[in-house]
Structure formats: C-alpha cells, structure tokens
Amino acid sequence: MNIRYYNTYEDDFFESKNQNYKLKDNYKWIKNNIFYKIVAFIVYIPFLIYGFIYTKLVLKVTFKNKKVLKKYKNYFLYANHTLEMGDAFNPIVGLFPNKPYIIVSPSNLGIPVIGRLLPMLGALPIPDGIHQMKKFIECINIRSKTNPIIIYPEAHVWPYSTFIRDFKETSFEFPVINNVPSFTMTTTYQKGKKKPKITIYFDGPFFPDDLDTKKQKIKNLRDKVYNSMVKNSKNSTYDYIIYKKN
C-alpha cells in the first residue's frame, strides 16, 4: 500500500526540474503576430493527436456526461489536480473540438524543450508579481469570451488523490465578472489490472445566485463548484495512493 503524508493542502508531491522558473518582465499572454499564430497552429496538431493517443490508449480514460458542455463554447471549467501528464491532455481531449486554455504554474514553462511550446498549446502561466497581474487578468477576460478556461483550484498535483481538497475563492471572480457559466471536471479512480481505471465526470452549468455583492456571488459559486466536485469524487472506488495527515 502506497501511503503519503501531508501537513497542509499546500504540500507538493510533484515538482518540475525548474520549480523556481520566473516569467520575464515583458512576458506577453496574448501574441497577435501572424507568424506566431501559424507556428502555434502547426505545433498544436501533433500535440492534439498525441493527447488522444495518451488519453485513450495509455490512460484509457472514460468521459461521462459530456452532453452538459454541448451548448457552450466559452466557460470556466474547474478540475481536481491528480495526474501529472493527464491533467494537461485530458481537458484538451474531453473538450474537443473546443480548444481550451489552461491556467498553469510558471514552473511548467521551465521544462526543457516542451516548456517553450506550452503557451502555443494553450498554457496561461500565473504571473509571479503584482506588476504582471493586470495583463494576466486581461488575457483571461479576453480568452473567456471565445474559449473554455481550465482551472485547477487545488493548485498542487496530488497523484491519484480520490478526495477534493479545500480550495480558495480567488479564481471564481473570473466567471462572475465575465458572466459566463462554470462547469466541473472530476477525475475519479476505479480498480484496474496494474494502475487504476480513470473515469472523468463533467457537471454543470453553474451560476452564482442573485446576491447583493460580488463577494457573495464569488463565494456562492465557489461552494457550488466545490460541492459538485465532492459529489462526483464519490465515484472513486479505489485508492491507489492513500493520503494521511501528519
């Protein structure tokens, strides 16, 4: 039995080789250069093909309740963070033909070779400092008008975790101020021959209740999303790794 011990939900069980990678001061989240867009399109095609192969043939993921997404092109999708590579590919395959943008840690851009390509594939790195936050928020607001935005509110990868960690309200301001729906994507695990079977459940749409203040709406939406993920996480029937608090 594989047991891992943690102190808080902020603990990391997976770190990239360049965990302290910093964005350049002049980093641009939206690049309008036509040549950049052409290269990004060319790079995205083999990435998408590999994603389908990895998700369907290696991880053997089953998607449930995709019908809830059918009517929508732009929305925020909140997911539990439990697979190192799978969390990069599963949303792209699950949401196809829509191209999602995924909010990621800047450390991902420090990965040799592939790190430089990630922004072309839809990665939106979180800025390190306040001075870059305005442009980051502008990018999220623009992208959310036309595409799905994927957010992992738990922030840290806990491989094969079968419970939903408590998370902050911060990222729920985006769907509230942009008045777009939110959905959940909950990865669950069942016993397999060698590694767990993976079943992913979609749920939604979720909107905040008609409350007096933006702060109340943000909390209300966060609670709806959290409760949905907790509900669907109950479909996990096998603990490949057990997490215990110190």
Regions found by a protein language model. Name each.
Residues 1-78, 86-90, 115, 120, ...:
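Membrane-anchoring hydrophobic helices of lipid-metabolizing enzymes
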Residues 60-220:
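Soluble catalytic domains of membrane acyltransferases
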Residues 226:
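A conserved mid-domain beta-alpha-beta active-site/ligand-binding segment of alpha/beta enzyme cores
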